[in-house]
Amino acid sequence: MSEVSRRATAVRPFVVMDIVARAKELELAGRDIVRLEIGDPDFPTPAVITRAAEAAMQDGSTHYTQSLGLPDLRNALTARYREHYSVDVDADNIVVTQGTSPAMLLLFGALLDPGDEVVMADPCYPAYANYVNFLGGVPRPVRVRASEGFRFRPQEVRAAINSRTKAIMINSPGNPTGAVLGQADLMALAAIAEETGVHIASDEIYHGLDYCGPDRTILQYTDRAFVLNGFSKAYAMTGWRLGYLIAPPAFVRPAEKIQQNFFLAANAFVQHAGVVALMEAQPDVERMRAIYDERRRYLVPALREIGLTIESEPSGAFYVFADARAWGEDSLALSYRLLEEAGVATAPGIDFGPGGEGFLRFSFAADVARLAEGVRRLGKWAAER
């Protein structure tokens, strides 16, 4: 009998991280690898943010904070939501976390009992199902289709809800698809939540990276909602680990208790840097967003030219989710072939659910020169295979 718990054994690995590890092995062996597999901004964190962190450390902000987070940061977040979304968020309903992933644990830990279900897209970010499974819940996937912009059909979401359903998980802009849910989509999902009594769990980590319209938060449409967000993507702060959960009032104290026991609090000086990010770094966010958009406009047609199918162009985030079945049905095997034979690292679509099989995710968190080199290598590989 294995000494490892069944709970740990059941957690699915991030397959893309295995691709990352192999890419690094090849680089250490002297290979030049075009890295298009990971969602990590290639920009440095804006200097105004790093200076704020340095100043906070020099001022002694190296100790514990309240588990809910620094009041200054929570108040800055309420101001941001008021100015950017015209939504009033009570600072008391915000829990600051060490990245958005811990916020997900707080959310599902406060919401789910064993056997409870969460409706989510297929394909979607794989951690959602892993968190739900780990806590004894049941993911309930609903297929979304490239031909429909990877957006939910409301009637299929409604049909997936039963007496054990606690939440509908959404992610807009989305990973891996770059899909953005419009006002009509969000209104329809909010109406389902109000009708059925479930909550919406909205992962909004890619807000600030929408190329076709304004950011929309689910809080504009219903208060039966949890919001997951953070600083990693738009502010180029993945390594800083700073996120937050906005929760309905009844769930704040339960989430706080989980935070106290699992994480205690986010780093003090990083929270101070977060305040400055919200107040002073928006021009940097817009500069990076504009550059990502240029890359998006290059990469989509370039991938089409070498034989990949893109029915739904990304409207947000920094990913292109391309149908690669012309090159092979098995996306994992194809990703490894492209890495070993072409020197290009990609994320296999199967990592994001059965609905992603046959697809590859390309990150454009790399400069245009590297994107062009990756496309050149892939085109050569496709022509010679």
Which residues make up each language-model segment?
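Short, contiguous pre-domain boundary segments
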Residues: M1-R7
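PLP-dependent class I/II
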Residues: V4, F14, I19-I33, D40-A56, ...
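A glycine-/small-polar-enriched, mobile loop at the entrance of the PLP active site in fold-type I
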Residues: E37-P41, A55-R74, E83-H84
